[in-house]
Amino acid sequence: CNSSPKSLERVQEITGKTLKFYETDIRDEEALEKIFTENSIDAVIHFAAFKAVGESVAQPMKYFRNNLHSFENLVELMVTRGKGANIVFSSSATVYGQPALDELPIVEEQPFQEASSPYARTKQVAEGILEDCVKAYPNLNATVLRYFNPIGAHPSAHIGELPDGVPNNLVPFIT
């Protein structure tokens, strides 16, 4: 698990709502099926991925298993249930590779370049999976968010970046 149960408590405090939480690995197809069966899910906001570029270079298989296998399970379950399926996918600007200065600023239509890390490759592959599945399954709708460096937190500071160990980006150092 690369999140904190404390975050769930904080979201409940902020919203005043009780949230249902399942602690599971979405690579576990049976557990994922159970969650969808027990709930009337018609939309998913998918943020479940490892995101440390350096770690992905050192441990690429960890990233492929977590970021891609879990994503495939989720999308397959969404499209085979026969209901309307909507997904918001958290991608990354790393899909653009390392553009040359004359290719800046980056625009959304800019083609992908060679992935600069296994993390970036997982995002490129996942976007490709979504693109193909949206074409093949009329019940699937997808929105992809390509962050450059997501920053910020709730004004209460109860939710936001909570890195384990040394942070991988600037914001935790300055907040």
Give the role of each language-model region.
Residues 1-155:
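N-terminal Rossmann-like NAD(P)+-binding domain of SDR-like oxidoreductases, especially those catalyzing
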Residues 121, 144, 159-175:
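Substrate-positioning beta->alpha
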